[in-house]
Amino acid sequence: MNKFYYICIYINILYVCVSGHGYMTFPIARQRRCSVRGGQWWPPNGDGITDTMCRAAYQNVYNKVLNQYNDPQEAATAAQYMFQQDNEYAALAGPDYTNLCNLQQNVVPNNLCAAGADDWDVVPFGDKSGMDLPGNWVPTVIPLDSNHQSSVALELEFCPTAVHDPSYYEVYITNSGFNVHTDNVVWGNLELIFNDTVPLRPKSSTSTCNANPNVYRFTVSIPVRPAQFVLYVRWQRIDPVGEGFYNCVDMAFDYAAGPSEEDVIYPDYEAPGQNAYTCHANRNKYGGNYENTIDEDKYQAQLDESIKSRYDKYSRHKGGKFGQKQCNGNKHHYNKYTKYYNQNYKNNKNY
């Protein structure tokens, strides 16, 4: 079976060429770390990969495709593609890309670290689902100045292999009960900590971005977690196609004297499966113990005014205003959103 690394998609009478576009370089994205460490080219079954989790990710896809096609070369091509396309962990949301429920339910409902790509037959994204395996992923370690710090202001760097503007960034963090060794990264265990436009800036002298002299650098206040955690970074283009890029970043904080034992959380619940999914962005509670993990009102209020104004010019067709789509039967009317936005945007911007 032949696979094309590039594809042109015809959407809304627009031809859009999709190719590689970038990755997190600091802290380094999971798929980028595997690509840089190498070892995927020989032998074909991935035994030459020295990093334990990168090898497990490779062999997960290799064995899946081998079982499907009974062709070792096809299986190797699929697994190598997951490493080779480290700058194209992408998904297309269409003009409704600001609708969080649409994103969670239809665009990247599972396999978040793979940007939802879990089928080798789907061109150009392929199967990158090995990156979603729980396990002992190597983190970027950030030292703490004090064991009593509640957050750390850290400058993040995204290396664009192709520049896309206008655009904006979102950064999520796994919650305090997340266990990287047993849990999948799912929307239900993510908390939004950053949402804003980011200008291109010259890269620093310590940058590992070799694809571009300019990078997206932005400072994020990261809540301190006592155990290893994951940042989930979304780089979203502002256009009718709604192309977005999704990276999992493995991180840990280095305590000066180690965290107190009582502060370390060991999850005692069963890790949710990839199919155990519900939307966590509805305005209303559904009864029982259901509670919104990511509040959509505050999520929408966080969208920068420049994002809103730029988006409006693209959203005049098909009623594509903010929050106008349905999520689990809730109709979000534009007028209601506008009223909320005007009254509460400034107060909620720093949520």
Swiss-Prot record:
It comes from the Viruses. Residues 1-20 form the signal peptide. InterPro entries: Cellulose/chitin-bd_N, GlcNAc_Chitin_IntDeg, Ig_E-set. SUPFAM superfamilies: E set domains. Gene3D superfamilies: chitin-binding protein cbp21. The keyword Metal-binding does not apply. Keywords: Disulfide bond, Signal. PANTHER family: CHITIN-BINDING TYPE-4 DOMAIN-CONTAINING PROTEIN, GLCNAC-BINDING PROTEIN A. This protein is a spindle body protein. Homodimer; disulfide-linked. This is Spindolin. It comes from Heliothis armigera entomopoxvirus (HaEPV).
